[in-house]
Amino acid sequence: MLKLAVICIGSILVISTLIDKSPIVLLTGLGAGTAILMLVFQDTIKGFVAGVQLIANDMLRPGDWITMPKYGADGDVMEVTLTTVKVRNWDKTIVTVPPYALVNDSFQNWRGMFDMGGRRIKRSINIDMNTVRFCTEEEMQSYRKQPWMEGFEATGNEEVNLYIFRHYLEYYLRHHPKVNQDLIMTVRQLQPTPQGMPVELYFFSADTSWLKYEHLQAEVFDHVLATLHTFHLKAFQSPSGMDFHNTIQK
């Protein structure tokens, strides 16, 4: 470092002597020139620094799926250069994002989901609260004969049909071959709303493929809707034109 400083100072003194100018004038000119160069190449400089940070911190790799709504990016990273990051969106459009934006702003990288081997499904169905009631003894006797009642924990002398339904759904998820059994899963109630009692299913698919993920999600909720009547429950939905028509006819 000392040798480098001596060389720099010596060079400045030699140049100032050759052009017959004060070293102070030369330093001032160099400072102004440096400022102009930084202004002209600021994107390149910031991109280079950001690129180093992205690589050093393993924040981004080609092939990663990222989402960055501010820049309209939602797809796979195609290329990372000093000045741009190219992202191919799912609609096949290509978005370019400056690397420093990925460092300064927040973005979502889905690599962890693929590495983990499970894709989260978090959806709820609204139950009509008018259909929530205690089960009769005959109903409980019928339920107890089913294999999904294994491990059932009674809450008291009378059981609520919604509680039985949640227990059934947990059994269904635990024995579904396309559900990741190594990750958390639960069926829970959310805060009641004017649209009914939300019952949320929270689990992870065993396959991270988008199409298989969507198919599993639809398959599970088709089953949920089809089994509601078994527990004498109904899903809530806003009245439609046909509902008003039937009411008028009555």
Report the location of each language-model feature.
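Soluble accessory domains appended to multi-pass membrane transport proteins
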Residues: 56-159, 163
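Long, non-transmembrane cytosolic or organellar matrix-exposed soluble domains/tails
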Residues: 145-250
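Membrane-contacting alpha-helices and adjoining membrane-interface segments
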Residues: 1-56, 90, 94-120
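Conserved, well-folded catalytic cores of nucleic-acid-processing
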Residues: 5-8, 17, 48, 83, ...
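Flexible loop/turn segments at secondary-structure boundaries
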Residues: 35-36, 84-86, 134-135, 194-196, ...
